[in-house]
């Protein structure tokens, strides 16, 4: 029962009140028209796997949300660090160990600005475990960013430090939980060890977690008559916007399907493009076709292309190979 389709069906009734009995009537009438389809039972094992893969997505979304929230506090304390271009940033990862140490160990920006460069270099080396190729340059960029940042009243620095440190602790704790869930997912899927899992795991870039996330939502491929049906179920389809001789180039993704499946397919596409030249070329081709929404558009279209491969392998019970496809015995 899709709430969106029922809500749209309700609009066909003119001048109807919004009450519980009338809601039940609309749902019953919707079912009478034969528009409700039941999902096939996939077994308790797939349901257990689905609980794990969906909980993993929940944790990932919590981490993303916490990072987005923490950026506001980072901007207040160290404004220039938050707005620097990717190539100009002193650290490749704003949420990494060295960045966390800089944001929490130094109470104010003046502590960085007026610190001897030698002490700052030693600090970067220690917190970065000697992994920086040019720690002196990193310290120089860090000091310049501190000089260029806005200054706050001194009473604000301590609360900001506490808030930022708390966010780092929350993120670290949730990342530990994600790793624990990953281990549980691998253990569960290896207990199933289905032919479908072998097919997906044979694709370069798709590991046990991504394969499990996809299979937990698909269940069995016989539920889908074509790769188009699978794409529609994942919500990786685009509506045509056309009138007369005009056809809009800006078409929005429907996103009306299974958002969990869509997430794991997009993540799989992002990983596969780093392992298979064919998908890498396709990604950058789509990336260069437009000037807006480049990354999201290219990734979504690459995921749609990956669906054709996944559907083909699962329906034919085959494993992936760069030169030939072999059948699973």
State each model region's role.
Residues 1-329:
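A detector of single, family-specific signature residues
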């Amino acid at each position: 029962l899709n709430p969106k389709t029922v809500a749209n069906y309700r609009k066909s009734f003119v001048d109807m009140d919004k009450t519980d009995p009338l809601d039940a009537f609309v749902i019953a009438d919707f079912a009478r028209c034969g528009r409700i389809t039941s999902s096939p039972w996939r077994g308790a094992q797939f349901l257990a796997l689905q609980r794990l893969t969906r909980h993993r997505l929940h944790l990932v979304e919590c981490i993303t949300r916490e990072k987005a929230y923490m950026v506001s506090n980072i901007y207040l304390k160290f404004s220039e660090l938050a707005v620097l271009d990717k190539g100009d940033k002193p650290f490749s990862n704003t949420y990494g160990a060295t960045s966390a140490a800089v944001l929490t160990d130094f109470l104010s920006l003046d502590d960085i600005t007026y610190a001897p460069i030698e002490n700052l270099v030693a600090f970067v080396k220690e917190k970065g475990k000697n992994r920086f190729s040019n720690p002196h340059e990193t310290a120089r960029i860090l000091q310049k960013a501190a000089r260029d940042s806005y200054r706050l009243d001194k009473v604000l620095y301590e609360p900001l430090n506490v808030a930022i440190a708390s966010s780092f602790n929350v993120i670290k704790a949730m990342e530990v939980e994600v790793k624990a869930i990953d281990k549980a997912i691998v253990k569960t899927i290896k207990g199933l060890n289905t032919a479908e899992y072998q097919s997906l795991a044979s694709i370069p870039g798709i590991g046990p977690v991504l394969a499990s996330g996809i299979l937990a939502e698909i269940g069995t491929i016989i539920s889908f008559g074509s790769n188009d049906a699978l794409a529609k179920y994942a919500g990786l389809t685009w509506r045509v916007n056309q009138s007369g001789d005009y056809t809009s180039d800006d078409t929005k993704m429907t996103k009306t399907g299974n958002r969990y499946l869509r997430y794991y397919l997009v993540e799989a596409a992002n990983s596969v493009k780093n392992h298979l030249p064919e998908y890498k070329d396709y990604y950058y081709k789509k990336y260069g076709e437009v000037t807006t929404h480049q990354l999201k558009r290219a990734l979504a279209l690459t995921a749609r292309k990956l669906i054709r491969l996944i559907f083909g392998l699962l329906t034919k019970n085959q494993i992936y190979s760069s030169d030939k496809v072999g059948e699973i015995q």
